[in-house]
Swiss-Prot record:
pH dependence: Optimum pH is 5.5.
Biological source species: Haloferax volcanii (strain ATCC 29605 / DSM 3757 / JCM 8879 / NBRC 14742 / NCIMB 2012 / VKM B-1768 / DS2) (Halobacterium volcanii)
Binding note for cofactor: Binds 2 Zn(2+) ions.
PANTHER family: ZINC PHOSPHODIESTERASE ELAC PROTEIN 1
Activation/inhibition comment: Inhibited by high salt concentrations.
Protein name in UniProt: Ribonuclease Z
């Protein structure tokens, strides 16, 4: 099952010519989940070819660079004759403000939009085989991060063992792999556990939004396939990071290291690094020795299963 992440906006509070405000989209086998919606997000979606079929929008907090794209997105979806509903999720206390954005200027969308508040530790959205969980973050206003966590997958099916046990090739293989026991014509029962290995973990993608480095992020991001973490400043602005409740690249890298994530994306890059963001990555790599990169607008990333190959970062343009 495919999973592709697209960085639509990787800038800080002040956009630059190269970086739009925060927006991050995950396409999981055709279902599109949007995390934050800064100004111009709908144009970024057009520019980078993600499509508009977003089913859920997960808002981390109510600062403008994370939400002011909502009115434009809603109206663009409506003008494109959208029929499907859209669910918007936000931190405690956000519902009224988010509803105002949906109806900015008295606008009444022609499709259903629902707004929900989610508390840290709760599930914002549950699908058949994955869920999106909210977790604690620390910013200057009510905020949450989100973790997309897939269910475990069935273990590997041992076809050779099944044939040795007399299981005929065909539908019985699928039933065994799905966890059912199978009775053969001679009355012998072949148990699923005899031919199926241990469950294999699904994928986890963690998106923090704006935050200080926290143990709660380490816990939820443990062994994650991708961590997208606030890395607004370099060490030289560490005091400012504390004052504004952001993270430095080094602090974010410590979270990535302690959580032992497979890949780590630095985002929410301050405009002061517009000419050269390389110091952020250099400082992060002094702490975290895994695959780390400064996310760029339009960058696309395949998120493979941990037991498969491939999945490196791509550039969108």
């Amino acid at each position: 099952m495919s999973m592709r992440a697209t960085f639509l906006g990787t800038g800080g509070a002040v956009p630059t010519t190269a970086r739009a405000p925060s927006a991050f989209l995950v396409n999981r086998d055709g279902e599109r989940l949007l995390f934050d919606c800064g100004e111009g997000t709908q144009r970024q979606m057009m520019r980078y070819g993600t499509g508009f079929g977003v089913s859920h929008l997960f808002v981390t907090h109510l600062h403008g660079d994370h939400i002011l794209g909502i009115p434009g997105l809603i109206q663009t979806l409506d003008f494109n004759d959208r029929d499907d509903s859209l669910a918007i999720h936000g931190p405690p206390g956000s519902k009224g403000h988010l509803e105002q954005l949906v109806h900015a200027g008295g606008y009444q969308p022609g499709f259903h939009v629902s707004v929900h508040e989610v508390r840290p530790g709760n599930v914002a959205y549950r699908a058949d085989d994955y869920e999106v969980r909210a977790f604690d973050t620390e910013h200057r206003t009510a905020s949450v991060g989100y973790a997309l966590v897939e269910d475990d997958r069935p273990g590997r099916f041992d076809r050779e063992k099944a044939e040795e046990l007399g299981v005929p090739v065909g539908p019985a293989f699928g039933r065994l792999h799905a966890g059912e026991d199978v009775e053969l014509e001679d009355g012998t029962v072949v148990r699923s556990e005899q031919v199926v290995g241990d469950p294999r973990p699904g994928r986890t993608v963690v998106y923090t939004g704006d935050t200080r480095p926290l143990n709660s992020t380490v816990e939820v991001a443990c062994d994650a396939d991708l961590l997208v973490h606030d890395a607004t400043f370099t060490d030289e602005e560490a005091e400012r990071a504390k004052q504004t409740a952001h993270s430095t690249a080094r602090e974010a890298a410590r979270v990535a290291r302690d959580a032992d994530v497979r890949r780590f994306a630095l985002t929410h890059i301050s405009a002061r690094y517009a000419a050269d963001p390389s110091p952020l990555l250099e400082q992060a790599r002094e702490v975290y020795d895994g695959e780390a990169f400064v996310a760029e607008d339009g960058q696309k990333l395949e998120v493979p299963y941990a037991d498969s190959d491939g999945g490196g970062a791509e550039t969108g343009e």
